[in-house]
């Protein structure tokens, strides 16, 4: 394996020799930084080699055929996929929508392509200062509005955070400075408080439990994530309780629940703020126990409790599984489940919608903030913020949507236009005799999926009525 990596390094070094980047550094530094990042993800040999060589066909006189001859079809295929992703630039609506479609096709074919692109983009963002302002703005906005949400949908929390924080100063420079200014003092204050809480909980677990403790740490909220939360909290930092969240990492699942019990023994939990994402993982695979308590001095304090494996998966998402032995059919099944949303994106464009509508669909249904609601059986449903019971019903199945007569949210009757919140338990009341949706539902539905299914019903009805008319006459 190392011999192949050395061979790839030699090819990259020779091909890029004498080339410089806009930042003034040797060009070779970029594929090296990309490869270091991929190694952090614990990815396979083909992906590591593709990372080293990903710019060779585009930036040098070496061809993809030469790479395939020396390193095989798999490596060449990955590099070709990365090259396609590199061509996604805003050049008018039609070309942009088509390029996005190509990107989703490439990712659906082999998700490792986007892992390489993430690593490549993170290093490019770190050297963005050397580019003209127009390019800075385009690359940063693309990273913030396309790549970061894709990382989020793949459960790659660490990568999403890096992409967002590196893009933030270029896309919203004034807001970035403001967030930096107001948060600096608060982070320092919060760190002292967090250190105090860590001492208390560590003492409790060491003296009064047999929990196999791996790590307790305070994790500061990333700047862009903080900015997004401030927008929802009237820009009042006093309303942000998870400026520094406490993370407890343990060996086993049983330990997670034990730790939760000890936290609640020390401090009273805040009602409605205990979330069990171990028993009910988020659709992107995220698992942890979350609890919010009235901590020392009555200060609201948030905890995340997880195993080492859950922690790795929460940071690297779907990429974490490349480091496990469960490759084969299990991994293929997992990948298919995690990429279901991407197949929906491709189907949306195949419905011959206009480029403008397709891009609106992306922003509304897929790249918007997400909420996680539950069916009465405990299944987690992933919807965009602002979604209603109508959206929920059509997400389950077209028949559930068409026969929907009402909704119960957390055991209370609610209107069909009620905006759902994360953690809601939603039950759809079915009327088997109902003929279909009401036209007014098009104004209630927030997702393109629900709207398209409602329109499809009316289009079918219209065709049937025409057919009946001609049959009568």
Where are these regions (language model features)?
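Secondary-structure boundary motif
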Residues: 40, 69, 206-207, 265
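Internal insertion modules embedded within essential enzymes
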Residues: 64, 72-75, 81-244, 256-261, ...
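Short hydrophobic/aromatic beta-strand micro-patches
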Residues: 249-251
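Metal-dependent phosphohydrolase cores
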Residues: 1-114
